[in-house]
Amino acid sequence: MFVDIRDFTPFAESNTAEDTVARLNALFEIVVPAVVDAGGHVNKFLGDGALAVFGAPNDLVDHADRAVSVARLILRRVDERFGGALRIGIGINTGAVIAGTIGGGGKLEFTLIGDTVNVAARVVQLTKTTGDALLLTQSCIDALAFRPPGLINRGSHALKGKSAAVQVFTLDPEIPAST
């Protein structure tokens, strides 16, 4: 799962460094606890975004359901905290990843690599094109134990580095998650 702030560059250009960092930290204060409370792990912060994983390094049978539930929670909490002053996109993909500690020269870092991660990164960028706050890949939908209400097919999209188009879906924000 990738979380990315929309239109962050103009905000950073028109605000102080302190305000910019405070805005990022305010978002991450929402993202990190939501992910961790659901058994996930925030792998890294990437500028104005974050990469979270459910099911690595420890396997979670319901990883896709947890990711979708957390994404909805993050979107709701961001809206409650910021209103329209901060817009984010979330992209979720499901599949095998290579997870491990890499590095050298005394600097080691747990990281995730592979096609699944790359597709999730491309899908979060696709939210800017579709205008959706959340996009899920077909792989994510297929891994769900429970199909969420309000699922909307956004069609197949060509993604950089992929020979085949990737089917994506969003969730109608007006339809609440089932309890």
Summary of predicted features, one role per range:
Residues 1-69, 110:
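Catalytic NTP-binding/metal-coordinating core of nucleotidyl cyclase/transferase enzymes
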Residues 1-2, 41-44, 51, 87-93, ...:
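Structured core elements
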Residues 120, 126-179:
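Cytosolic regulatory/linker segments at or just downstream of nucleotide-handling modules
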Residues 53-63, 90-110, 126-130:
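Catalytic strand-loop-helix junctions within cyclic-nucleotide turnover domains
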Residues 25-40, 56-90, 115-124, 138, ...:
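Alpha-helical scaffold within the catalytic cores of cyclic-nucleotide enzymes
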Residues 9, 51-52, 98-99, 141-142:
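Nucleotide phosphate-binding site architecture
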Residues 84, 96, 104-106, 160-163:
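Short flexible coil/turn linkers enriched for glycine and charged/polar residues
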Residues 20-23, 27, 46, 63, ...:
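Helical mechanochemical/support elements of P-loop NTPase systems and associated helical scaffolds
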